[in-house]
Amino acid sequence: MTPARHFSARLRTVFEGVGHWALSTQAGLKPSRLLPQQASPRLLSVSCADLAKRQELPGKKPLSEKKLKRYFVDYRRVLVCGGNGGAGASCFHSEPRKEFGGPDGGDGGNGGHVILRADQQVKSLSSVLSRYQGFSGEDGGSKNCFGRSGAVLYIRVPMGTLVKEGGRVVADLSRVGDEYIAALGGAGGKGNRFFLANNNRAPVTCTPGQPGQQRVLHLELKTVAHAGMVGFPNAGKSSLLRAISNARPAVASYPFTTLKPHVGIVHYEGHLQIAVADIPGIIRGAHQNRGLGSAFLRHIERCRFLLFVVDLSQPEPWTQVDDLKYELEMYEKGLSERPHAIIANKIDLPEAQANLSQLRDHLGQEVIVLSALTGENLEQLLLHLKVLYDAYTEAELGQGRQPLRW
């Protein structure tokens, strides 16, 4: 037997070894893997723009625009089939010394429905398969046992999903928990007990279950967000979204860098979150589906208020606002009249300074001048964004509706 003092000495040696190993391991860690108390000084920043981003330790690398096109899907063609009904049973009661017990075949169970449900945690149609088959009902049994009905199959889709059949809109799942029965399950078959009659005391007839309903549905996603950034290609919308949130859309010096909508979350005190959508750049004639205009414009329909992003370095920048409002109005009447703010981006460029006064004179309203690249005047945008959100919330509550919570 090992003496107690020897055991405690060995235990002390083991703990000391573990302590030396932990210190040496932390010393060899890269800066990106440091513990929270060793994080970079940027995490301690108290500026308004930095507080709008939720501070997190570096993790996985952001998805590139090419990979994002695989993960973000805004259209699906789905074949949905309801569950088949179970077959009825044809049998007779069997009991000792009772030769003619009568029919006791039970009915089959009903097939399960296929239901689409709007889920707040789902942001894309990428998880939706191209075919769904509902659960079938069980067959009936003897002793008047009915078959169990098939379970309901739920398909989770993001909020803002339009369900179309043959070019006709059959459902609009715009709220959390909205459901739509995509395919009905088949009815269960009848057992021979169902056909018992005065003129037929021993029926042997039973019916099979009915097949489930089959439908081809087209799912279209319209991005649901509080604010939607609208502008021409290369206006700096993606750079602006990166500056005020943790979203990481692709940024490059050529137009049409963004091909799919991005949604960034701006954080405020009191755990308030405002969702801002970066809509791909639209061009003149977008309402006629030029440059995939219809595919881009439909993501603006669900935005509660708009942010018109103008490239201040371009000649006559006020024409950009007029053209954007015209395209929105031609696409959907009243869309351009929603609450909005005008953002003049790229003020850090020399040619932008000369256009600023002309822009204000032509528009005759407040213009938020900033630079997404340098972060100049981002605080004014964040404060004005909060004002637009408060006005939207007050209007929704005044009409007895709950505002959108992200």
Swiss-Prot record:
Q: How is this protein named in the record?
A: Mitochondrial ribosome-associated GTPase 2
Q: Name the GO cellular-component terms.
A: mitochondrial inner membrane; mitochondrial matrix; mitochondrial ribosome
Q: What's a BP term from Gene Ontology annotated to this protein?
A: mitochondrial large ribosomal subunit assembly
Q: Which residues bind Mg(2+)?
A: 238, 258
Q: Which residues form the Obg domain?
A: 70-224
**Gene Ontology molecular function terms on file:** GTP binding; GTPase activity; magnesium ion binding
| Pfam families, sorted | GTP1_OBG, MMR_HSR1
Q: What PROSITE patterns does the record tag this protein with?
A: G_OBG, OBG
Species annotation? Pongo abelii (Sumatran orangutan)
Q: Which compartments does it reside in?
A: Mitochondrion; Mitochondrion inner membrane
Q: State how it assembles.
A: Associates with the mitochondrial ribosome large subunit; the association occurs in a GTP-dependent manner.
Task: Give the region (Not localized in the mitochondria) as residue ranges.
Answer: 30-406
The organism's lineage is:
Eukaryota, Metazoa, Chordata, Craniata, Vertebrata
Residue ranges of domain OBG-type G in the record: 225-390
What is this protein's function? Plays a role in the regulation of the mitochondrial ribosome assembly and of translational activity. Displays GTPase activity. Involved in the ribosome maturation process.
Annotated region Localized in the mitochondria: where?
15-406
- Residues annotated as binding GTP are 231-238, 256-260, 278-281, 345-348, 371-373
Q: Which UniProt keywords apply?
A: GTP-binding, Magnesium, Membrane, Metal-binding, Mitochondrion, Mitochondrion inner membrane, Nucleotide-binding, Ribosome biogenesis, Translation regulation
Gene encoding this chain?
A: MTG2
Topology versus the membrane, per the UniProt entry? Peripheral membrane protein
Q: Which prosthetic group or cofactor does it need?
A: Mg(2+)
Concerning PANTHER family, the annotation shows:
DEVELOPMENTALLY REGULATED GTP-BINDING PROTEIN-RELATED, MITOCHONDRIAL RIBOSOME-ASSOCIATED GTPASE 2
Q: Which InterPro entries match?
A: G_OBG, GTP-bd, GTP-bd_Obg/CgtA, GTP1_OBG_dom, GTP1_OBG_dom_sf, OBG_GTPase, P-loop_NTPase, Small_GTP-bd
The entry's family comment says: Belongs to the TRAFAC class OBG-HflX-like GTPase superfamily. OBG GTPase family.
